[in-house]
Regions:
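Amphipathic alpha-helical and helix-coil boundary elements used as assembly
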Residues: 1-204
Length: 204
């Protein structure tokens, strides 16, 4: 008979953080980065998260305005050139704020790879203040493995630390196979961005 293709759309538990838009103000400039994240997360019972961003004072008024908690934390962390990375392998909310400092216990050195450069992102970072970024730091490796790791994970590849930027999972001969895109830490920096909806709004 004819083969059938089943298409599924799935979300991990961090979707719970991306539903309700909220307004709130963090007024204490002495509040640390970690405390702010913890304040946002305190309503999500059972959540698990790790923060790999220096616990420095936020230094200014920080406003969440008509943003979900996920949107707000992503924007807030962009100030420190870092990102949120969700762990899709857990049933409850789990994420890492910033890249993991702990390498996974896998060896992918023998795997075939595809080497490439993301020139658009390279130029964008260079012209927006990250002029120390080199061409080699912008290199990307693409490897396929049956090991399961999450976005943001660190892997020692060919003797150097690399980080999983994205993954595509496919079924091959009944086995789950993942195609990983690896970047160096510098190539995964994000540029700060702002909530345009705040412009012109009176904050009481």
């Amino acid at each position: 008979g004819e083969g059938k293709i089943l298409v599924l759309t799935a979300w991990d538990a961090t979707m719970q953080m991306d539903i309700q838009r909220k307004k709130r103000i963090f007024q204490n400039p002495e509040m640390g980065v970690h405390q702010l994240v913890s304040e946002v997360m305190k309503t999500y019972i059972g959540s698990d998260y790790k923060i790999h961003v220096p616990d420095v004072p936020i230094g200014q008024l920080v406003v969440q305005y008509e943003e979900t908690d996920w949107e707000f934390l992503k924007r807030f962390l962009s100030k420190y050139n870092e990102m949120l990375y969700s762990d899709t392998t857990f049933p409850d909310i789990r994420f890492e704020a910033g890249l993991s400092p702990h390498p996974e216990a896998y060896c992918w050195d023998a795997l075939p790879f595809v080497l490439s450069q993301d020139l658009d992102k390279f130029v964008e970072l260079k012209v927006n203040g990250m002029d120390q970024l080199t061409g080699s730091q912008n290199t990307m490796f693409e490897v396929a493995s049956y090991d399961v790791v999450t976005i943001g994970s660190q892997v020692i590849y060919k003797g150097s630390p690399w980080f999983v930027e994205s993954t595509e999972r496919i079924m091959e001969n009944g086995l789950l196979k993942s195609v990983y895109r690896l970047r160096q830490r510098e190539g995964l920096k994000v540029l700060p961005y702002f909530n345009q909806n705040i412009t012109g709004v009176s904050i009481d």
